[in-house]
Amino acid sequence: EKPVVYDDIDGLDYEAISDSNPDVILAAYSGITQEEYDLLSQIAPVVAYPKNAWQTLWREQITMDATAMGKQAEGEKLVKDLDALIKEKTANYTDLKGKTAVFCYFNPADLGKFYIYLPTDPRAAYLTDLGLSFPESISKLGADSFSIEISAENIDVLKDADILVAYGNDDLLKALQSDALLGTVPAVKNGAV
């Protein structure tokens, strides 16, 4: 039986969740509040993030979710298999070794600010699985959240990044390259986005 996945952008639909009669509610990678946790717990056991919202790394997510579903051995095997696959695939990209990277979100309609996913965010943390590291300017940013908003005037935080990872396409790269501030970032100039 396939799990039911809910879009929670407009809040949790407790009635729909209850109607699906879940055995367990998986929210290891979520931002549920204590109040939401308490309400969901009235429906079924809830696996919530252990420390901070949106900061449960993928290995921990798999382990927690698999354990909650009574499939701990399968979860451990999946983590091991994925680690082996990552190692196998990254072996083909030795030129990434020693490079720094930053995972960002840019809105092409408003390049006056952007967001950096911090090393505690699973998307950003995955970059280290690929053999990349974070520039010192990013590593020393606060870790209370999974991301931080940066004004384009503070673009210097990206100057040491060899690679920028971002959601978007070639149009985003063109917009970044033609922006007066963002276009000065070496990774943007070099097309390493």
Q: What annotation goes with each model-predicted range?
A:
Residues 14-21, 149-160:
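Short helices/loops that flank or line small-molecule/ion binding pockets
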Residues 38-110:
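Extracytoplasmic substrate-binding proteins
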Residues 113-146:
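Alpha-helical, coiled-coil/dimerization segments enriched in small aliphatic residues
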Residues 1-68:
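Acidic/His-rich segments in extracytoplasmic proteins that coordinate ligands and/or metal ions
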Residues 6-14, 141-152:
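Short helix-initiation/N-cap motifs at beta->coil->alpha
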Residues 24-28, 47-48, 101-104, 163-166, ...:
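Structural recognition of the beta-strand scaffold that forms the well-ordered cores
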Residues 67, 158-193:
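Structured C-terminal subdomain patch of bacterial secreted/periplasmic proteins
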Residues 30-33, 52-55, 106-111, 169-173:
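Solvent-exposed loop/turn segments at secondary-structure junctions
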